[in-house]
Structures are given as structure tokens and as C-alpha cells.
């Protein structure tokens, strides 16, 4: 087997448990062991950079880099930026009237923050899942800011069967769903896989020398792209179907078990 030199990890549902709202101790120890072995480890998340800082409170080491906002903003531990791409401003202008008319909740992601047009029961559900009951706050200026600010991603609180309605107004964008109640929206040519390409090009690592772990629909492109794509046991069926390997859940040492299976640790 090709020696693995870089591994990419989703956060929520992959290294962080939805049940305990934290990183299992064994998973943290395994991640640290990878670094000690000289393997580079990277976060690959739909979260914006400011929503990844909590990792510093949970771990006594740093990742080598971060693929954030589903690949739209990628940077190394030293702060060097490898990828920086915003959503089509034309798409955003086109879809805002649809959101208003249909009272659709949307969170607009910036690099250093986010703002929301309205809150509803689906938003409350996500706050509970993330263990952050006050994460989202309505901004009365949301629609004005959506036009004037650089928006990297939308979190649109619709069910899968409702996606087509708003995507009809966003021809340069695509949905990247990882849960039932909402979908991430990113550029059509974006995705965590583009972040992987930026990272390995920087370090001179071959694609076949990479692994990726994920559990959600927004991880599919990444898992298909990496040398070895591993779906967590708690992943959706659509994710498991495309994975090279299905491990146990995040709460049952899924990261560690898969790495042992492939003799990485």
C-alpha cells in the first residue's frame, strides 16, 4: 500500500461527536500520534475559520492546515492562504427575493463572522445539534449586507426536496448537504476536494498518498477524490455508497479503527 502522507478530517460527526459535543479522547490521541509519525493532518469542514477555533481548547496540538467553508478558504497553520473564493454575487442578488417571499431562513457566511435573515424551528434544531443554543441571531440588515459583503457560503434551511426552488436562481452555485434540515451552498466548481488539491500542491504530496474521513453529503466529493475515502459508521447511506471503506462511528473509535485497518498507525 502507498504510504499515507496527508489525512483530511471533517469535524462534525467525524472527529467531533454529535452525542457528546466534543472530540473523543481516543480520537484526540490518535490525531496526535499521526503528527508524531510525521503525517500531516488537516481539517476539512463546512465551518468558517472563526467556527473552528474551539479545536484549540480541546486539543494540545495544531492541525497542519484548514480547509474551511467547504473548500472556499484554505490556509496553513502559519496563516498562509492557499485558496480564497467567494460565492457569485450575481447569484446572491438573484436569490434574495425568493428567500424573502418564501420566508426561508439563511445564514450568510463571512470569513470572520456570519449573519442570518430569520430564525425558525430548523435553525433551532441546528443550534441544539451543535450544542450552541445562541449561535444564530437575526440581523435586520441581512439582505443589505448580503449584497455589500463578500459571502463565502450560504446555509439555507430547506429540506432536500425544496432545494430546486432556490437553486433555480443560483446557476453558478450548488448545494452540499450534510444534514436533513439545511444545505450548504457553495460555488459550482467548489468543494472540499478543491481544498485537498490546493494543499497537496503546496506540499508536493500525491493524491494517492492521501486519506479523507467524513460523514456528510458535503464530504462526498472529498472522499471520492482522496486516495482512500473513509465514511464514518454514522455517515449517511449516500456517503457510505461512495466510500472506499466504512469504519465504525465517531463514538466507537471510527478514526482509530480505520487507520489501524490500513496500517497507518
Regions found by a protein language model. Give the residues of each.
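Short active-site oxyanion
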Residues: 38-42, 63-64, 151-154, 208-210, ...
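Short, structured coil segments at secondary-structure junctions
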Residues: 59-62, 70, 169-172, 225-226, ...
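Active-site phosphate-binding/coordination module
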Residues: 25-123
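Conserved acidic, metal-coordinating active-site core of Asp-based
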Residues: 98, 102-213, 217, 221-222, ...
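Asp-based, Mg2+/Mn2+-dependent phosphohydrolase catalytic module
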Residues: 225, 233-265
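Asp-based phosphoryl-transfer active-site loop
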Residues: 3-20
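Residue-level signal for inorganic ion chemistry
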Residues: 34, 154, 196, 223, ...
Amino acid at each position: 500500500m502507498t504510504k499515507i502522507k496527508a489525512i483530511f478530517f471533517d469535524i462534525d460527526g467525524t472527529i467531533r461527536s454529535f452525542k457528546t459535543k466534543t472530540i473523543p479522547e481516543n480520537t484526540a490521541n490518535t490525531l496526535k500520534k499521526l503528527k508524531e509519525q510525521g503525517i500531516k493532518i488537516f481539517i476539512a469542514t463546512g465551518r468558517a475559520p472563526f467556527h473552528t477555533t474551539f479545536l484549540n481548547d480541546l486539543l494540545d496540538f495544531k492541525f497542519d492546515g484548514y480547509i474551511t467553508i467547504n473548500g472556499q478558504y484554505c490556509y496553513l497553520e502559519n496563516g498562509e492562504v492557499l485558496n480564497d473564493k467567494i460565492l457569485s454575487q450575481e447569484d446572491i442578488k438573484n436569490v434574495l427575493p425568493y428567500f424573502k417571499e418564501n420566508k426561508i431562513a439563511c445564514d450568510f457566511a463571512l470569513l470572520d463572522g456570519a449573519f442570518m435573515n430569520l430564525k425558525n424551528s430548523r435553525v433551532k434544531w441546528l443550534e441544539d445539534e451543535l450544542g450552541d443554543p445562541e449561535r444564530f441571531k437575526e440581523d435586520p440588515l441581512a439582505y443589505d449586507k448580503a449584497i455589500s459583503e463578500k459571502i463565502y457560503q450560504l446555509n439555507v434551511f430547506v429540506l432536500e426536496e425544496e432545494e430546486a426552488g432556490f437553486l433555480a436562481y443560483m446557476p453558478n452555485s450548488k448545494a452540499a448537504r450534510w444534514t436533513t434540515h439545511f444545505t450548504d451552498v457553495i460555488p459550482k466548481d467548489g468543494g472540499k476536494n478543491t481544498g485537498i488539491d490546493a494543499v497537496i500542491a503546496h506540499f508536493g504530496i500525491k493524491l494517492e498518498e492521501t486519506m479523507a474521513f467524513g460523514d456528510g453529503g458535503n464530504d462526498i466529493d472529498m472522499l471520492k477524490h482522496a486516495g482512500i475515502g473513509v465514511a464514518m459508521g454514522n455517515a449517511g447511506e449516500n456517503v457510505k455508497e461512495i466510500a472506499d471503506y466504512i469504519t465504525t462511528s465517531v463514538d466507537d473509535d471510527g478514526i482509530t479503527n480505520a487507520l489501524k485497518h490500513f496500517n497507518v498507525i
